[in-house]
């Protein structure tokens, strides 16, 4: 232990990152400083932080070709809630038009016909959607990643749907584990997605048909005044303290996600955390109706 206050600074900048249309940087503020030798705690009630631009290129430069003309509507909503200065930044710009972008569905060969109703529906509602057989791309994640990257630049890709279980549709491997979202990390070396990635996990045509039918019904027949649209569930283990995201335990990470959801449009987010959580809590939540479920922890 050293006779000094930690952390030494009151604020610091994180590494620059790219999230599709913008380059961002997080500012971390430390209103508490602790000296372990004197056991003294400093508490700052007011801190002013000045952030200045420099002429250096820095990490993860965003090489935009010309001025931004259009923006994916869903990403615009993300930007508004992600960047503290988004509205001020955009007020000094011309009007940027909303657009849908495009959707790419990569499927295991045996499920191609079962996906046609979904492709037809997506195109009918105005989202340009293309269905591709994974065998026409390549059977490994490197070939798929390159195809997705090329499609992103050529077709303004916004949504990627993988169809099939991992034995039929490989995932990107990160740290020895599969990571579907990594297919969406196109720009920079960060973990902020340029493309939203999902998967229909399926071992049979029946599995695919069920998910296709439910997806179409969810979009085509929205339920008026259904409160479950604004309810979610968070599931977290008691592990991970000190080694998780920003040193959080799994349940703390879920609580942070919960706070963001409650600050958005959600009215209720279940806290199914260890110790004490059980599968019955999850079953009850699902049967009552939830629009999103998040899990942080290890499988066994």
Could you describe each region identified by the protein language model?
Residues 1-300:
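Cysteine-dependent hydrolase recognition
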